[in-house]
Every structure is written in C-alpha cells, then in structure tokens.
C-alpha cells in the first residue's frame, strides 16, 4: 500500500482491501495542485523536552536538475502565521523554550501569501516562553540584505545557519541549475558573519560529490572553496540518480566507485 499523507484517512480501508484479496496493491497518491493550501499537522510533544520543531512551509518552486522534491511535494505552500503562532504558544505552555522552524524551502515562506521569513521570526520571538529560535536549511540567493538585517536584530535567534551550497564549483552549480555562483554564496556568508558577529555565527552546509560531468578539477575547485569558507560542519554525500529528474539523463555520469573514493 502506497499512499500520500493527504489520503491517510483511507489507509485502513486500503490495507483491508489487500488483506481481503480485493487488491494485490493499492497506490493512492494524488498530485499536488496549484493553489493548494498548507496541510496542518500540528505536534505538541517531542522526544526532546525543551526543543520543538515547527513546520511552516511545504513544497518547492525550484527545478534543480538533481531534485525530485518539486514533483513529489508540489509547489510552495506557506502555513498561516496565525496557525504557527498558536502552535508556538501551545508549545511554550507545555514547557518548550526552543523552537526550530523547518520547511522544504524555508526562505520561500510567505512568497505565496505576501509575508516573509524575517517577519515570521520577529513575531515568533514575541511569543512569551519562547527563548530561542533556530532556522532550518536556507538557500543563499533567497536571503536578502534586509532579511539578514532584520534577523540579526532578533536576540532570540540563534546565529547558526545551514546555508545550502551543493558544490564549491560554479561550473557544477550551473549544471545543477542552482541559481547562484560560488562568489554570490561567499558574499551572503560574509554578510551573515558581519551582521551577527564573526565570533558568534556558525555556518554549516551540504555538498554533493560526483554530479554528472564533474571533473577532477571541478572537484578540486569545490574542495578549495569549501576549505576557504570556515564551515563549522560539512555534510558530504554522493550524487544519487533520481528517475524523473533532468540529471538522471545527463551524460558523463560519474562511476559509483569514484564518488565513494
């Protein structure tokens, strides 16, 4: 039985059909539609008794060559700020003093509703009982100077940022269809360090190795760029082909043994 979360109400019936022999398999996944609203799935308890995770957005409007998320998750759908703040108040009342705002495309929050991430963080910081706010992964090209200025003015925001890189080679970034260069990435990272204070801020990132067409020189360029950025932590993982993405059919696929070496 394969079903989407939007059809979870029918999962017992679907399983029963298979058990009864009415069906050998059930695939019940409905595609996301443009204009679809954010699906509310609030949580009030977490394994960590002080830190809670609050999802504020789903979907992605980008078309990175390697990524299947837009196809699987649909377009950007922002959760209403009223709903988010209500959940934060419930969490604070339950003893959670730290929240992590998460999303599929966090900087896209509010792009479909006329608001924005910086505004949400400002309002979240005003919730009584919430003492620390952390952010999920951020795309460098979607952080404006005004966003950085406003975020730096929120004392409750922890200055630890996961700034997605994917490659330290501008050539590879173009092939990936990422909308920034390494120079632009470095400029945003520098602005974060300046705004929050070099001694206070920490930046982590992720890097894909073995993307189709990546040469030894591209790899060396990527390594050199990463080394120069003074990241607190780098999550490195090999490129994995995803059927239905443009990169799946790209020429010059890198052999698996090279990716792992």
Where are these regions (language model features)?
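Terminal RNA-binding accessory module
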Residues: 249-261
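Pocket-edge positions in alpha/beta enzyme catalytic cores
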Residues: 3, 75-76, 112, 177, ...
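Short low-complexity, flexible loop/linker segments enriched in glycine and/or proline
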Residues: 19, 114-116, 249-251
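Proteins enriched for Cys/Gly/acidic motifs involved in redox and nucleic-acid/cofactor modification
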Residues: 1-109, 144-146, 151, 157, ...
């Amino acid at each position: 039985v394969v079903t989407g979360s939007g059809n979870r109400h029918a999962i017992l019936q679907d399983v029963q059909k298979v058990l009864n022999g009415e069906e050998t398999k059930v695939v019940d996944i409905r595609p996301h539609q443009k204009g679809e609203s954010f699906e509310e799935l609030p949580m009030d308890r977490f394994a960590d008794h002080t830190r809670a995770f609050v999802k504020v957005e789903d979907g992605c409007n980008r078309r990175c060559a390697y990524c299947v998320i837009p196809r699987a998750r649909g377009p950007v759908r922002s959760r209403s700020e009223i709903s988010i703040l209500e959940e934060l108040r419930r969490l604070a009342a339950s003893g959670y003093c730290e929240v992590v705002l998460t999303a599929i495309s966090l900087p896209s929050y509010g792009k479909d509703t006329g608001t924005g991430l910086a505004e949400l963080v400002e309002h979240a910081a005003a919730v009584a009982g919430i003492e620390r706010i952390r952010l999920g992964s951020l795309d460098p090209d979607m952080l404006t100077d005004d966003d950085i200025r406003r975020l730096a003015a929120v004392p409750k925001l922890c200055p630890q940022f996961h700034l997605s890189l994917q490659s330290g080679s501008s050539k590879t970034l173009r092939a990936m269809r990422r909308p920034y260069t390494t120079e632009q990435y470095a400029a945003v990272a520098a602005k974060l360090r300046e705004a929050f204070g070099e001694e206070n801020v920490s930046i982590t990132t992720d890097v894909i190795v073995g993307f189709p067409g990546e040469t030894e020189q591209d790899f060396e360029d990527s390594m050199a760029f990463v080394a120069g950025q003074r990241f607190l932590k780098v999550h490195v993982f090999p490129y994995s082909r995803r059927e239905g993405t443009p990169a799946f059919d790209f020429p010059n696929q890198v052999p698996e043994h090279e990716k792992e070496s």
